């Protein structure tokens, strides 16, 4: 009987080890995410989040006044050892200013992070798959010619999204899920 149960559960257990998914929406993972705007530096950009039944909606307006220029949606700090994965799949839709996926390895704002730009979707749902090692290193918004290293995937402590164009305008970004595989 025990052998039979193990055989039945084995495919499920393997699937759990081969994928890690952050699913958004009411009563799901969206409540662990918060908005951080450029107001932390004196800027006047605005952003807000709203949980829907199956997604998280992040929208706002980027302002360049007072040296502003960004709005971000971030998961609370946690350990994300994603070193067993090669790809990230994201289902989202967006309009307005484009956004980027970000990974942080430090709580300090001035320590370089990693990001990759996401294509706009004209408000149509899109599912993309990106190679994790294609994320690039950035230092305070400036690209450093270095890709994310496989060993750094053990050090990720925050996942997020940030407006990716330093220009005035509205944006809307709705995300269904992030899946590491």
Please name every model-derived segment.
Residues 14-181:
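Beta-rich carbohydrate-recognition modules and glycan-binding surfaces
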Residues 3-13:
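Sec-dependent N-terminal signal peptides
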